[in-house]
Amino acid sequence: MSFFSDFFNSKKTEIFAPLSGDIINIEDVPDPVFSKKIVGDGIAIKPSSNRILAPVNGTIGKIFETMHAFSIISEDNVELFIHFGIDTVKLKGEGFKKKAKDNQKVKIGDEIIILDLEFIKEKAESILTPVVISNIENFKKIKKSSGTIAAGQTVIITLYH
């Protein structure tokens, strides 16, 4: 089999935008943990909306106590990590309101966290939000989207198994 037949016949998983805004290259995030892909590969979002939505059908793994980040595992075992902003852990949960809980089953578009975007913009180093695939080594190819995106509607990443 050729590369192309593998590619076109392989299973794919689509990751939807958890926030509305603009896609930024993960390499441009001002935190080396993300820009050097230490925790996985993906994209970042410069958000324009205040609701973080489930990007896949799956199960919430862990919502951090400070509510600035969470993990989610899709029904087909894609492990995602969504981290709102840079140094937002220092806000100790202020500006974030949890709408979901650990181990909760969710569908694409379900609310996970509500943000006070203006407050966080004022207090955080950056509001760029990395969306990374933690188990990226399990996939043959990653296709990243670009441009302006709508939460729960735009595919931001396509993974080929």
From Swiss-Prot:
Residues at the catalytic site: H83 (tele-phosphohistidine intermediate)
This protein's GO CC annotations: cytoplasm
GO biological process: phosphoenolpyruvate-dependent sugar phosphotransferase system
Cofactor(s) the protein needs: Zn(2+)
Residues bearing the modification Phosphohistidine: H83
Keyword Kinase: yes
Site (Important for phospho-donor activity): H68
The entry's keywords: Cytoplasm, Kinase, Metal-binding, Phosphoprotein, Phosphotransferase system, Sugar transport, Transferase, Transport, Zinc
Residue ranges annotated for the PTS EIIA type-1 domain, each copy included: 31-135
Annotated domain remarks: The EIIA domain is phosphorylated by phospho-HPr on a histidyl residue. Then, it transfers the phosphoryl group to the EIIB domain.
Protein name, as recorded: PTS system glucose-specific EIIA component
Organism: Buchnera aphidicola subsp. Acyrthosiphon pisum (strain APS)
Gene symbol of the encoding locus: crr
